[in-house]
């Protein structure tokens, strides 16, 4: 299957980056290159675009989409969590703009064959980086029941985490759970009968999201990225983040507020002792959301939140 993906909120995200000719911009989740093409059109040929992705299929497609821009685009197969190290390896001290899109591509969900979708019956894999060893099947079949409860509750905010974990443990006593279809049926059966057909989202939605987050250490990666990225942005440069669930969005919102603070001393101290300097100005006081028209055209955009900050 060819790589298919529609970038979410591309015009708003690229506009917030303040792209201009000659700037250096990093797209830390290159995907199919939808955002990157728009960025490249605005900063090249004088500027430089750095495209990072750990999925080799995404990188291959992006290289085709961006081939017209030639050597002014640098491609890096890597994890956005290692952004600072990647810049060091390229001998680039700082950039003018950073874009991070935390969503899955349509290809990953529908065409990768890695079990991201509960609507398909595929190997229960869920790795964004196929070279990684841990799979969703490993977690489902080897984790203790208590650990499954924690994963579903912490990463999926799933109210029936205990019931679902118990059903999984019961099912795997007979045979390993190896496909996305198997897991989806187990989760649906674990739900109270009255809620299976009345819930606004499919019963398997939160469990699949939780497993994907756990397999790919998504929240840990985001934390590592946020720990260092602001130091790699030039004064006046901007960072834009597209989050697709509340856990990510809360992390980004809190970190931007922390960057904006000039002092983080406990309240009541007569004199500041932390010596913290204000690092950014928040550009989006309230997260931007897609229009109803975009959601209708691209349902994957439904939950996205876009936040931006400017380095001072």
Curated annotation (Swiss-Prot):
UniProt cross-references to Gene3D superfamilies, sorted A to Z: Putative methyltransferase TM0872, insert domain, Vaccinia Virus protein VP39
Superkingdom assignment: Bacteria
GO molecular function: rRNA (cytosine-N4-)-methyltransferase activity
Entry EC number(s): 2.1.1.199
Disulfide bond annotation, renumbered to this chain: none
InterPro entries in the cross-refs: RsmH, SAM-dep_MeTrfase_MraW_recog, SAM-dependent_MTases_sf
Catalytic activity: cytidine(1402) in 16S rRNA + S-adenosyl-L-methionine = N(4)-methylcytidine(1402) in 16S rRNA + S-adenosyl-L-homocysteine + H(+)
Subcellular location: Cytoplasm
Top EC category: transferase
One term under GO cellular component: cytoplasm
Binding site for S-adenosyl-L-methionine: 33-35, 53, 80, 101, 108
GO terms of biological process kind: rRNA base methylation
Record keywords, A-Z: Cytoplasm, Methyltransferase, rRNA processing, S-adenosyl-L-methionine, Transferase
Annotated function: Specifically methylates the N4 position of cytidine in position 1402 (C1402) of 16S rRNA.
NCBIfam families, A to Z: 16S rRNA (cytosine(1402)-N(4))-methyltransferase RsmH
Similarity remark: Belongs to the methyltransferase superfamily. RsmH family.
HAMAP family found in the cross-reference section: 16SrRNA_methyltr_H
Name of protein: Ribosomal RNA small subunit methyltransferase H
